[in-house]
C-alpha cells in the first residue's frame, strides 16, 4: 500500500509551489523561501509504503530525508527511541560525517512521502545557508537528550529481586535479612512490586528493567503426576517469573535456590541455571543459620559481577 496520487500534488510546475510551501515548515528551513526553493530543486520526491524501511542501521548510504507527509519510527538495536513526522528530517548525521554509518533504522508506520537530498547537495546548501548548521546542531542536541532519557542510569548498588511462593516468604525474608548489611538492595514481591493500579505483568516488567539479579526459591509447593510418576514442583508463578528473569538478565544473573535432599522438578528449558542449595527447616528460628552458606555464595557472586 502506497500514498497513490498524493505525490502528484508536489510534482510538476504547479506542484513545485506546493512543495516549497511545505518545505517552509521544515525545522531546518524555518520559513526561508530561498532555502526551501533550493531544496526543492536538488531533492527527489519518493513514496514510502507503510512498514517500508527508509534507513537501515549500520548502512553506509548518506542521503538526508525531509518528511513531507506521513510518520516514521526510529529504532536502535530493534528498540524504538523516537518518532518522526511531517516537518522533521532524518539522516543528516551520515551526510555530515563521511565516515559515519547509519546510527538507527527508520521505518514508515504509515504511507509517507519524503524529499531525498544527496549528502553533497545537503552540505553545499548548508554552507550557503549557515542557519542550517545552527539548526542541525540544535536538533542533534535535542535528539541526544531524547536518547539519554531512554537510558537507565547504572545502579551504584546491585538490585536483587526474590521470586517465591507465599509459602516460601519466610525464606525470602531470611535471605533479605542475611544481606541487609551488604551494599545490595533486596526486594521481595511483597514490597510494593504489584501496585493496585497496574497489572501484575506490567509490574514484573518494571522489575526486569530495574533489577541486576534475581533469586528464585524453589521448594516443593505442589505435586504433579507426569507419565505415572509423581514429582514435586515449585508453584507455577515461580516458574513463570523465573523464565522472565532468565530471558532478560541471562543465566549468569539468575539463580535458583533448591532445598538439599528434596528434588524439585523443573522444566527442561530452565536446566543449566546456577543452583545454590540450602537446608530446608520447618523452624523459622533456624532459617538464618540454614541459609547463611547460600547467602555467602550469593554475596560473592553479586560482588564479583556488580550492577549490570
Curated annotation (Swiss-Prot):
Annotated compartments: Cytoplasm
Catalytic reaction equation(s): NAD(+) + H2O = ADP-D-ribose + nicotinamide + H(+)
Highest taxon listed in the record's lineage: Bacteria
Record bears the keyword Nucleotide-binding: yes
Region (TIR-like): 160-278
Enzyme Commission numbers on file: 3.2.2.5
Enzyme class: hydrolase
Residues binding a nucleoside 3',5'-cyclic phosphate: 54-143
Function: Pycsar (pyrimidine cyclase system for antiphage resistance) provides immunity against bacteriophage. The pyrimidine cyclase (PycC) synthesizes cyclic nucleotides in response to infection; these serve as specific second messenger signals. The signals activate the adjacent effector, leading to bacterial cell death and abortive phage infection. A clade A Pycsar system.
Protein name (database record): Pycsar effector protein PaPycTIR
Organism: Pseudomonas aeruginosa
Taxonomic classification: Bacteria, Pseudomonadati, Pseudomonadota, Gammaproteobacteria, Pseudomonadales
Amino acid at each position: 500500500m502506497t500514498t497513490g496520487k498524493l505525490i502528484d500534488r508536489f510534482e510538476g510546475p504547479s506542484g513545485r509551489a506546493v512543495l516549497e510551501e511545505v518545505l517552509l515548515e521544515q525545522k531546518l528551513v524555518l520559513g526561508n523561501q530561498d532555502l526551501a526553493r533550493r531544496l526543492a530543486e536538488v531533492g527527489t520526491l519518493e513514496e514510502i509504503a507503510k512498514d517500508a524501511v527508509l534507513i537501515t542501521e549500520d548502512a553506509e548510504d548518506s542521503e538526508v530525508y525531509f518528511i513531507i507527509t506521513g510518520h516514521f519510527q526510529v529504532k536502535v538495536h530493534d528498540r524504538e527511541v523516537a518518532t518522526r513526522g511531517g516537518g522533521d528530517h532524518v539522516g543528516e548525521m551520515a551526510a555530515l560525517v563521511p565516515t559515519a554509518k547509519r546510527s538507527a533504522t527508520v521505518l514508515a508506520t504509515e504511507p509517507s512521502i519524503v524529499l531525498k537530498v544527496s549528502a553533497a547537495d545537503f552540505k553545499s546548501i548548508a554552507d550557503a545557508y549557515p542557519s542550517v548548521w545552527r539548526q542541525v546542531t540544535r536538533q542533534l542536541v535535542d535528539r541526544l537528550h531524547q536518547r539519554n532519557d531512554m537510558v537507565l542510569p547504572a545502579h551504584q548498588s546491585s538490585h536483587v529481586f526474590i521470586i517465591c511462593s507465599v509459602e516460601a516468604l519466610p525464606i525470602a525474608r531470611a535471605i533479605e535479612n542475611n544481606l541487609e548489611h551488604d551494599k545490595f538492595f533486596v526486594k521481595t514481591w511483597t514490597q510494593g512490586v504489584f501496585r493496585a493500579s497496574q497489572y501484575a505483568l506490567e509490574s514484573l516488567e518494571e522489575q526486569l528493567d530495574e533489577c541486576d539479579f534475581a533469586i528464585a526459591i524453589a521448594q516443593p509447593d505442589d505435586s504433579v503426576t507426569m507419565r505415572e510418576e509423581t514429582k514435586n514442583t515449585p508453584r507455577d508463578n515461580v516458574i513463570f517469573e523465573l523464565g522472565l528473569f532468565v530471558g532478560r538478565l541471562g543465566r549468569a544473573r539468575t539463580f535458583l535456590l533448591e532445598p538439599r535432599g528434596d528434588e524439585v522438578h523443573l522444566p527442561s528449558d530452565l536446566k543449566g541455571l546456577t543452583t545454590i542449595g540450602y537446608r530446608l527447616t520447618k523452624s523459622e528460628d533456624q532459617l538464618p543459620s540454614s541459609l547463611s552458606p547460600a547467602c555467602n555464595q550469593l554475596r560473592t557472586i553479586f560482588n564479583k559481577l556488580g550492577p549490570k
